[in-house]
């Protein structure tokens, strides 16, 4: 290559060029223009003044790709082109610059590829720097790689500076739309040649890549494939390949980089299109999502029943179609002289609904058994509506104090009008409880009045309403369901752990219900509930049996107060405070002593670890805590009589809070300890933990004076 002067001497006044885009070309005496290229050329030529008659070798540009946002500007009048003194200046073919409105081609010399358009830097004096590593023609000399790298770096700087000129250059070109048509035809012919000769990239360096120009006003850049040079002498190409083998390697690397950039630009343009379509797709998807719930709601074809007398039909053969199932169901009922108004099949075809004309037909249909439709024995029952649970509760009774060995058949003999009987059991063992459901609420009320206190295998049963009716009953309610200040239930405490319900039944002969709470191991918790048919019976038992000895222990009896009774102690909570404990009492023993308790904690000395004689017992609900408190009032645990009280709720200074306060003379920590006690929220152990915090807070500058209370 010809080494171009980077800081040439000041040249004569340059010749001003016509409005861009135009090409710069020098006359070449030694090169000939091919006829095809002369036909293709449509741009204007500007001759750069030559100095000292020296001829510079023609430079050829390698492939270049310009991003849509980057424009290439030809030399402007402010730019002075300089050639190396002492050498003959040769024509430097300019690379064809294409705009959406006008295409300009530049004739190239024979044996040389068209050069890249000279890039001008406004206001900068010096030699015009050609594009990336140009190759010499027939008279070109090979240059060192260092000089080539310097040329590339300066060219990159010029390219960056020319970005500001792009908009001014594009607009004049857009006004000449008349010249665009011929150029476009030539470009189409040359595009075909480009496609055929893609495999000759390494041998033919005269090939140029597509240049993209961005139209003004933000329009999408049009891609135009420039013309490939024609009629290049093969012998000269081979000579150039031998001479510039090293340059080809560098050019190929640069070409690959340019191609990668072009591919990235195309990918960005392709990615923009789906983004525009996304809103529409989202709307369609949202519409589908909105429609989905409606489809889910419609589980049955024609969900609206035609009559008020409906029957649920289950276990249908879902392998059949809905019309087939409708016909089959209608035929089955028609054979039994039942007229079907309509049949509605579920979407899964596993169930359906049948509408009848009258309640009589519906009742007759419910009495049918063993009906088969397409080989499946269908299930018939009344449909379950929104209020079905409420209705079932109103016509259902709870029977308690049943013999543990009683069966459904035996109960069926007692409750003749019962529609369904469900025995309650746990781990395979009966709990002496059953639910008796009737067809109507009137039947349930009638049975409640007539069968209350009926004996079964020597045990007097107790009946209760379920649902809303049962909420108005006494805790151990009976026939008189509302509280009138006269309880019918006795709470028995200090009961021997070996005592059973059968043992108590022998003592309290008039009792209608007896319950001895047991722990997980089946061991008695030391208290019981004894219910009578009337307040008089309960009061009589209280007066005659209180402090009576049963299996070696003197029992204590008291009337049970109702939930929310004015006689109940104020501010109940879920936690009981228990004091008077033996030092030998463990947390497990304390927990087992209270029916329904979920955990228990005993407060211990932080230094010795021995019990302080009090603790806390937690329950799931206030009701459970109340019942346990009444049962264990003045009771004994491990031989010690205990005293019960409600644990103070948060904000009222629980016992643990006081412990924390005493331990926290260390300042702030002590205060935190007190609040920790309040945080016990009646759960005892947490209050003790507050005391522990008080001790820790007391540390620091002073020796802790509180005692650590450790739980769990």
Curated annotation (Swiss-Prot):
Residues 1-305, 642-712 are annotated as: Disordered. Keywords: Acetylation, Cytoplasm, DNA-binding, Isopeptide bond, Methylation, Nucleus, Phosphoprotein, Repeat, RNA-binding, Ubl conjugation. It is found in: Nucleus, Nucleolus; Cytoplasm. The modification Asymmetric dimethylarginine is found at residues 658, 662, 668, 672, 675, 681, 683, 689, 693, 696. It holds the Pfam family RRM_1. Residues 309-385, 395-468, 488-562, 574-649 form the RRM domain. Sequence repeats lie at residues 58-65, 75-82, 83-90, 91-98, 99-104, 105-112, 120-127, 128-135. The modification Phosphothreonine is found at residues 69, 76, 84, 92, 99, 106, 113, 121, 214, 303, 369, 407. Some glutamate residues are glycylated by TTLL8. This modification occurs exclusively on glutamate residues and results in a glycine chain on the gamma-carboxyl group. Symmetrically methylated by PRMT5. The keyword Disulfide bond does not apply. There is a cross-link at residues 299, 326, 591 (Glycyl lysine isopeptide (Lys-Gly) (interchain with G-Cter in SUMO1)). Residues 56-107, 122-137, 172-183 have a biased composition (Low complexity). It comes from the Eukaryota. Coiled coil: none annotated. Transmembrane segments: none annotated. The modification Phosphoserine is found at residues 28, 34, 41-42, 67, 145, 153, 184, 206, 358, 460, 462, 565, 582, 593, 621. GO terms for cellular component: cytoplasm; nucleolus; ribonucleoprotein complex. The modification N6-acetyllysine is found at residues 9, 15-16, 96, 102, 109, 116, 124, 320, 350, 379, 400, 405, 429, 446, 469, 479, 515, 523, 574, 579, 648. The keyword RNA-binding applies. There is a cross-link at residues 299, 326, 372, 379, 515, 579, 591, 626 (Glycyl lysine isopeptide (Lys-Gly) (interchain with G-Cter in SUMO2)). Nucleolin is the major nucleolar protein of growing eukaryotic cells. It is found associated with intranucleolar chromatin and pre-ribosomal particles. It induces chromatin decondensation by binding to histone H1. It is thought to play a role in pre-rRNA transcription and ribosome assembly. May play a role in the process of transcriptional elongation. Binds RNA oligonucleotides with 5'-UUAGGG-3' repeats more tightly than the telomeric single-stranded DNA 5'-TTAGGG-3' repeats. This is Nucleolin. It comes from Pongo abelii.
């Amino acid at each position: 290559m010809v080494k171009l002067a980077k800081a040439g001497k000041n040249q004569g006044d340059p010749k001003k060029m016509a409005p861009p885009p135009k090409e710069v070309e020098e006359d070449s005496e030694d090169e000939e223009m091919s006829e095809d290229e002369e036909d293709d050329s449509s741009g204007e030529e500007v001759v750069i003044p030559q100095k000292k008659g020296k001829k510079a070798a023609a430079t050829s540009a390698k492939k270049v790709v310009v991003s849509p946002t980057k424009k290439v500007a030809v030399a402007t009048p402010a730019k002075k082109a300089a050639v190396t003194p002492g050498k003959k200046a040769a024509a430097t073919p300019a690379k064809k610059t294409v705009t959406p409105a006008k295409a300009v081609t530049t004739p190239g010399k024979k044996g040389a590829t068209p050069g890249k358009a000279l890039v001008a830097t406004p206001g900068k004096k010096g030699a015009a720097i050609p594009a990336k590593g140009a190759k010499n023609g027939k008279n070109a000399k090979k240059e060192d790689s260092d000089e080539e790298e310097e040329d590339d770096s300066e060219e990159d700087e010029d390219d960056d500076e020319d970005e500001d000129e792009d908009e001014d250059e594009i607009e004049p070109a857009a006004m000449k739309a008349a010249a665009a048509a011929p150029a476009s035809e030539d470009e189409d012919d040359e595009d075909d040649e480009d496609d055929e000769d893609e495999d000759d990239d390494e041998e033919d360096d005269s090939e140029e890549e597509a240049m993209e120009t961005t139209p003004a006003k933000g329009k999408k850049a049009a891609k135009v494939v420039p013309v490939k040079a024609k009629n290049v002498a093969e012998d000269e190409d081979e000579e150039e390949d031998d001479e510039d083998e090293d340059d080809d390697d560098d050019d190929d690397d640069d070409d690959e980089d340019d191609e990668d950039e072009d591919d990235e630009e195309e990918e960005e343009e392709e990615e923009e299109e789906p983004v525009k379509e996304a809103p529409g797709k989202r709307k369609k998807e949202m519409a589908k999502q909105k429609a989905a719930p409606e489809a889910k709601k419609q589980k049955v074809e024609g969900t609206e029943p035609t009559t008020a007398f409906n029957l649920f039909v289950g276990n249908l053969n879902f392998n059949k179609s809905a019309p087939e199932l409708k016909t089959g169901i209608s035929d089955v009922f028609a054979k039994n002289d039942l007229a079907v108004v309509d049949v509605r099949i579920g979407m899964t075809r596993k169930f359906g609904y049948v509408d009848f004309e009258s309640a009589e037909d519906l009742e007759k249909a419910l009495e049918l058994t063993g009906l088969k439709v397409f080989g499946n024995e269908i299930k018939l029952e009344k449909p379950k509506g929104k209020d079905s649970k409420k209705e079932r509760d109103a016509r259902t009774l709870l029977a308690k104090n049943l013999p543990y060995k009683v069966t459904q058949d035996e109960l069926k003999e007692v409750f003749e009008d019962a529609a369904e009987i469900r025995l309650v059991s746990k781990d395979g063992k009966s709990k002496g409880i059953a639910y008796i459901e009737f067809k109507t609420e009137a039947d349930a009320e009638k049975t409640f009045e007539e069968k209350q206190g009926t004996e079964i295998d020597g045990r007097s049963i107790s009946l209760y309403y379920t649902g809303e009716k049962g909420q108005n009953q006494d805790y151990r309610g009976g026939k008189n369901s509302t509280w009138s200040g006269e309880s019918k239930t006795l709470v028995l405490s200090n009961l021997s752990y070996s005592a059973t319900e059968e043992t108590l039944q022998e003592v309290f002969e008039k009792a209608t219900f007896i319950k001895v709470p047991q722990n997980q191991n089946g061991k008695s918790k030391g208290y019981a509930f004894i219910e009578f048919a009337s307040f008089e019976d309960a009061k009589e038992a209280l007066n005659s049996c209180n402090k009576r000895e049963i299996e070696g222990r003197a029992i204590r009896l008291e009337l049970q107060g109702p939930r929310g009774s004015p006689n109940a102690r104020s501010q109940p909570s879920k936690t009981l405070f228990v004091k008077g404990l033996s030092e030998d009492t463990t947390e497990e023993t304390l927990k087992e002593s209270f029916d329904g308790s979920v955990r228990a904690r005993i407060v211990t000395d932080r230094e010795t670890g021995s019990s302080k004689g009090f603790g806390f017992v937690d329950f799931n609900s206030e009701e459970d805590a109340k019942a346990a408190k009444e049962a264990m009032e003045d009771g004994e645990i491990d031989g010690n009589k205990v005293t019960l009280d409600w644990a103070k709720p948060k904000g009222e200074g629980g016992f643990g809070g006081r412990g924390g306060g005493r331990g926290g003379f260390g300042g702030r920590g002590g205060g935190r300890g007190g609040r920790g006690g309040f945080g016990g929220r009646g759960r005892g152990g947490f209050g003790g933990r507050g005391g522990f915090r008080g001790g820790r807070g007391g540390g620091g500058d002073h020796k802790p004076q509180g005692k650590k209370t450790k739980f769990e």
